[in-house]
């Protein structure tokens, strides 16, 4: 039996209907299945998630399942998996997603050939069987560059707007440098400060072509579909992302980008707020005011000018309230 070369971190909560597909596809990633180590974090599931993993992973030689009595959230669950990485490479997958055969072997080959800190890939969304290719927003393929050079321009979609942890693979030196862990306690938007830290502090990355990873959309239990107080975690997540940028030696270069992204996401959540409870809607508006105050004042107007007309209108009242306070 060969030693594993890649650790796959799979956090899951109540993923019983889907996780069998996820695990089955992981078993098709290498000709020798012992090259993969699977770490599953069952994050307080109340269904048969653990049993499904045990069943579908029964022929995989390197599987470890951690069980949290109560859910700790995606960020902390991923961190539990990161603490167990003992291979040269690691990656993430969520419990309702799956991947085409040989994806991970292709990514390992790219990592070894390019010798960079991490690689990123396109992904495919699946919404009730309707599939759409989502391209990683970076032109050059297979070319190693500084991650900092993939952050700008401020008014375009760039790699920091593509924060999906599962859309790539990482060398363990990213972990050793303290760049892989997520902000604990966040149930949503945990990947926003993470992606900024990664692109500001890692040394090299590339976007590469690989067999697809498929992201299942429209799952009713997914936090992207739930409109409750957990959605408000985007507020501390973006506050931390702003701090990450402000601490950088080129903060002035990147503040326009984080200001624009933050305000765009605030407008998005305000638009969705009509479906929230009154209490959550009030908390959202209060939190957005605080987040706007965290953005340097001189960045507000330029960032507003980069937004769509609709998003500017949505934010206008709160911006006035912050300025008049």
Each PLM stretch: what is its role?
Residues 210-219, 224-253, 266-268, 272-296:
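Catalytic core of nucleotide-sugar-dependent glycosyltransferases
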Residues 90:
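Short aromatic/hydrophobic "clamp" motif used to bind/position activated sugar donors
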Residues 1-3, 35, 45, 113, ...:
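Membrane-interface aromatic/basic loop that binds lipid-linked glycans or pyrophosphate carriers
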Residues 74, 95-208, 213-231, 241:
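Donor-binding/catalytic cores of nucleotide-activated saccharide
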Residues 14-28, 52:
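Short, well-formed alpha-helical segments that are part of the catalytic scaffolds
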Residues 42-51, 70:
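A conserved acidic beta->alpha catalytic loop
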Residues 68-85, 98:
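Glycine-rich, basic loop-to-helix element that forms the pyrophosphate-binding segment
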Residues 4-7, 37, 193:
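Cell-envelope/extracellular polymer assembly enzymes that use nucleotide-activated donors
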């Amino acid at each position: 039996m060969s030693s594993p070369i890649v650790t796959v971190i799979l956090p899951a909560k109540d993923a019983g209907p889907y996780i069998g597909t996820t695990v089955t596809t992981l078993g098709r990633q290498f000709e020798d299945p012992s090259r993969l180590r699977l770490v599953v974090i069952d994050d307080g599931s109340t269904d048969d998630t653990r049993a499904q993993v045990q069943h579908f992973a029964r022929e995989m030689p390197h599987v470890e399942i951690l069980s949290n009595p109560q859910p700790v959230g995606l960020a902390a669950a991923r961190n539990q998996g990161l603490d167990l990485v003992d291979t040269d490479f690691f990656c993430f997958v969520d419990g309702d997603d799956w991947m085409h055969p040989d994806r991970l072997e292709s990514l390992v080959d790219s990592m070894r050939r390019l010798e960079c800190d991490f690689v990123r890939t396109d992904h495919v969304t699946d919404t009730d069987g309707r599939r759409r290719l989502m391209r990683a927003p970076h032109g050059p393929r297979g070319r190693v560059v500084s991650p900092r050079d993939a952050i700008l321009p401020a008014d375009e979609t760039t790699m920091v707007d593509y924060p999906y942890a599962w859309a790539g693979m990482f060398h363990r030196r990213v972990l050793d440098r303290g760049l892989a862990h997520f902000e604990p306690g966040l149930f949503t938007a945990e990947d926003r400060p993470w992606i900024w830290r990664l692109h500001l502090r890692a040394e090299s990355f590339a976007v590469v072509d690989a067999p697809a990873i498929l992201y299942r959309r429209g799952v009713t239990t997914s936090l992207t579909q739930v409109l409750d107080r957990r959605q408000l975690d985007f507020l501390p997540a973006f506050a931390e992302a702003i701090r990450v940028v402000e601490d950088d030696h080129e903060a002035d270069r990147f503040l326009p980008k984080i200001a624009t992204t933050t305000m765009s996401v605030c407008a998005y959540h305000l638009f969705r707020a009509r479906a929230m409870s009154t209490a959550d809607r009030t908390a959202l508006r209060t939190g957005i005011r605080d987040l706007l105050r965290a953005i340097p004042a001189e960045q507000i107007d330029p960032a507003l000018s980069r937004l769509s007309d609709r998003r500017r209108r949505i934010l206008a009242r709160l911006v006035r309230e912050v300025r008049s306070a």
